[in-house]
């Protein structure tokens, strides 16, 4: 009996020490993308998917301060132990799920619309991630297959950067450097890529600003 108690105590201690993660999903058939899943680890590793069985997820690294800020908001939300749904009669904006995992500890809450200020703040951050990865996918496609469309893709990226909507901007650097150094792209595209590359290397606003 004492052995079983010791085993359970050890398992509980391991679960408490396990690194936490946050999982956000949104299902909204008819929208683009119709489904997203974003997993954020405590150390800032992030995985973005547009299908449950996505074979080519986007993986990136958040700045430590950004990851810390996001997990701080999750703590304010009591690790999703309480409901966030407003209950108001509003239009369908997609089923969102916030999920907290740490060892055997799992909490999640689902909602269409929330009036909770911290819940809305966290949702807005995840929406920024979705917007950012859509811009990344668009730019990557243009760089590879549509050189004349690169400048337009960069204009959109620049606009979102000016609005402080970009998350983990350094993920764009390999693409931007490829454009700025390659004379086969339009001169204006190369100039814009160089300017964005310099700006992204200079830092960005905090995740929850």
Predicted features and spans:
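N-terminal, post-signal-peptide region of Sec/Tat-exported proteins
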Residues: 39-73
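Short, mixed charged/polar active-site loops
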Residues: 35, 55-57, 106-108
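Short, solvent-exposed loop/hinge segments that bridge or flank secondary-structure elements
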Residues: 30-41
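Short beta-strand/loop motifs in extracellular/secreted proteins, especially
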Residues: 36, 44, 96
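Hydrophobic h-region of N-terminal signal peptides that target proteins for export
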Residues: 5-16
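Short, well-ordered, aromatic-rich surface patches in folded extracellular/luminal domains
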Residues: 16-28, 80-209
């Amino acid at each position: 009996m004492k052995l079983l108690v010791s085993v359970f105590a050890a398992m509980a201690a391991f679960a408490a020490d396990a690194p936490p993660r946050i999982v956000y999903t949104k299902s909204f058939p008819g929208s683009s993308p119709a489904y997203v899943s974003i997993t954020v680890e405590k150390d800032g590793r992030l995985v973005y998917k547009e299908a449950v069985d996505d074979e080519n997820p986007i993986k990136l690294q958040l700045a430590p301060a950004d990851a810390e800020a996001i997990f701080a908001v999750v703590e304010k939300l009591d690790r999703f132990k309480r409901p966030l749904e407003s209950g108001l009669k509003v239009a369908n904006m997609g089923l969102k799920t916030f999920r907290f995992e740490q060892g055997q500890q799992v909490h999640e809450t689902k909602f269409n619309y929330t009036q909770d200020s911290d819940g809305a703040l966290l949702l807005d951050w995840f929406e920024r991630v979705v917007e950012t990865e859509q811009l990344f996918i668009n730019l990557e496609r243009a760089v590879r297959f549509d050189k004349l469309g690169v400048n337009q893709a960069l204009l959109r990226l620049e606009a979102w950067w000016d609005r402080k909507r970009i998350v983990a901007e350094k993920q764009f650097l390999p693409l931007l450097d490829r454009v700025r150094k390659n004379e086969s792209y339009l001169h204006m595209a190369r100039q814009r890529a160089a300017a964005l590359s310099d700006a992204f290397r200079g830092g960005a606003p905090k995740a929850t600003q």
